[in-house]
Amino acid sequence: MYIDVDNQKTYIATGSKDHIQGNMGITFIHGTAMDHTVWTLASRHFARRGLNILAVDLPGHGRSEGNVIPSIEGMADWVIKALDASNQDKSIIVGHSMGSLVAFDVAARYPDRITSLAMVGTSIPMPVGDVLLDNAKADKHVAKEMVNFWSHSQSAHLGGSQVPGTWMLGKLIRLLERSGPGVIYNDLKACQDYSEGLERSKQIQSPTLLIL
């Protein structure tokens, strides 16, 4: 569904189910240069268990309008605005990679809005190598190839999907290629620059699941 956040058209996938007023929400936040589609299976699973799904496209990603946000804190503030625009008072929050930092920052600074936190493929801090950053800044395709390569295990490189015919590396590289100019650099730089994580961990009040 589309909502309005900061006067910009914003896309939120709902797992093909309408939101039900009063139901618990679960907010999914994608990683660098990705979009809501990485959460398709999880969204459908939890939607069919009665949760209101908010798999967001951050500004400048996927189907959402607007410029990319240059900081993790800024993205976290935006997520709260998206919850407000969706009339979702409280939510479970789940993030992958860059999205895990955003989810973490939301949980740390807005504890009254978050009931539990899940962080997938995460690290605090989340340093990014100079070679990757330089290639991303130059908007070279090799930056997307690096992200794709390092995002999959050895078994996935050999076609280790449980779904016959699924090519995980091929799917991700096409997703990264759909991102606009400068998006991958913006997101990687935001991860690199997020220096408040260890200190903010003291503010986390909600139960937290790490999937590493």
List the predicted regions and their residue ranges:
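Conserved alpha/beta-hydrolase catalytic His-Asp/Glu region
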Residues: 134-204
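Flexible "cap/lid" loop of the alpha/beta hydrolase fold
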Residues: 101-149
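Active-site glycine-rich loops that stabilize anionic/oxyanionic intermediates
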Residues: 31-34, 97
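Short beta-strand element of the alpha/beta-hydrolase
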Residues: 22-31
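Short beta-strand/loop motif that positions the catalytic acidic residue
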Residues: 204, 210-212
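Active-site loop/oxyanion-hole signature of alpha/beta-hydrolase fold enzymes
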Residues: 2-15, 40-48, 52-98
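Alpha/beta-hydrolase active-site loop signature
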Residues: 33, 58-62, 124
